[in-house]
């Protein structure tokens, strides 16, 4: 291949491929000229490699690997359901954005996988809590690895 560079397909956000196309698959890589960055298709979304995705939630939700969630339980308890079939090393981060976990808990539903080696859901009731869970395999499941 030498020392030259490879030029990926280039197009705007509006020109992203989609639908039924034999050249459009999970893992497709392109340069998006609208945002001035590389992006790849993960099977459901176009994502920029190395860029963290954030989501603000205030009601129960299904958590996705690789995302950071700003959770507001000001309106009542929120349940975050972990992925049923996580990949080894999958990571999910939660922040108590409203500082209300002490009055309205965050419940992390294990979805059949252990949390810290226990077969029980995780109840978070510490105001201002911020933590990440990383999937370590079937024995210990999801582990808290940063607080």
Across the structure, where does each feature detected by a protein language model lie?
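A broadly tuned "polar low-complexity/structure-edge" signature
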Residues: 3-18, 131-133
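Short hydrophobic/aromatic-rich beta-strand motifs
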Residues: 18-41, 66-72, 87-98, 120-124, ...
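Short edge-strand/loop segments of extracellular domains
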Residues: 109-118
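Short, solvent-exposed loop/turn motifs
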Residues: 30, 45-46, 114
């Amino acid at each position: 291949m030498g020392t030259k560079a490879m030029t990926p397909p280039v197009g705007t956000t509006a020109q992203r491929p989609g639908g039924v196309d034999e050249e459009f698959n999970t893992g497709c890589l392109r340069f998006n000229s609208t945002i001035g960055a590389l992006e790849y298709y993960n099977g459901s979304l176009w994502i920029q490699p190395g860029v963290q995705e954030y989501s603000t939630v205030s009601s129960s939700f299904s958590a996705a690997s690789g995302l950071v969630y700003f959770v507001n339980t000001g309106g009542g308890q929120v349940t975050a359901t972990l992925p049923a079939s996580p990949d080894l090393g999958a990571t999910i981060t939660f922040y108590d954005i409203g500082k209300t976990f002490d009055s309205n808990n965050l419940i992390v539903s294990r979805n059949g996988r252990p949390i810290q080696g226990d077969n029980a859901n995780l109840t978070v009731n510490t105001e201002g809590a911020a933590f990440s869970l990383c999937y370590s395999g079937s024995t210990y499941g999801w582990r808290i690895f940063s607080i």
